[in-house]
Amino acid sequence: TQYSILDGAAAIKPLIKRAKALGMNAIAITAHGNMYGVKNFHDTATEAGVKPILGCEVYVVKNRFEKDKDEKAGDHLILLAKNLEGYHNLCKMVSYSFTEGFYYKPRIDKQLIEQYHEGLICCSACLGGEVPQAIMHNDIEEAERVVQWFKNIFGEDYYLELQLHPSGDPQKDADVYENQLRVNKVILELAAKYGVKYICSNDVHFILAEDAVAHDHLICLNTGRDLDDPNRMRYTFQEYLKSPEEMAALFPDHPEALATTLEIADKCEDYKLTHAPLMPNFPPPEDFPIALGELRESFVKKIEDEEMLAKIGACATVPELEELVAGDKELSDRLMVAKQYCYLKDLTYK
């Protein structure tokens, strides 16, 4: 979606509308490295009667604490939350990717995956994934090690991915399509050898085929390159939301891989993201002489009195000001903002 900053050009509402028009009963969001759009996506899809699958295309490096230019991007990996526990675990990993792993991009590592894998479905991703990268570097043994590692962690919730983007452009096809054909062949062999299911997927960055040119301009903005630069980054123009019929035509020999995508959708539960406001608890001093039921509100009143008197000083005896202060406190009590007041006081206290 557009939440993959300067990389995705699919607005959420039109994306959901298009998915529904194509007869899809579920759709996933996997923005690059972030979860900025999950609430908007979840609400929009739910309202439209399409099951929202919340995920992220994370960047995985060997050690998230090391800031090494050789690993500034990391390998791509798809993580999907199949239940609320998985959603919370994904939120934790993505948060750590920013607070601990950020270096050019938000990055996680396998230590985090081991720690927070519960409730998550894992897919091997595009050509930027660790398995495809090993295959493209002719290191099949490494690809096998990676597959085994992820299968040991995720079990039946680990899936290998097949992708095909035939553009008809010889230059683009040489860079992407030919590599995809080679990678897919080995992935099918690895899937059979290690008993891992595989899916057919499409790397969606925009909604309709005719949106490809606009997306191409967006990539130029992202990379700071001119449109007529022959060496700039180019997509295949196949990265749109394809219909089930188009996907079946791309993979006529693997209908089972298309069906497996529905298996993933069925695994993902419906869960709500809304809840009551979460406010921290700020216990007043132990020697504060008020009954427990009145404790926090009374402590806040004491703070307000002291601060208001300090602000208005000698003018506190003016009846108009006293009435204004009383009205402000009455409104504060009505809105039950005592906890919030303690929270803001804690943030600004020196």
Predicted regions, residues:
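Phosphodiester-processing cores and adjacent nucleic acid-binding clamps
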Residues: 1-350
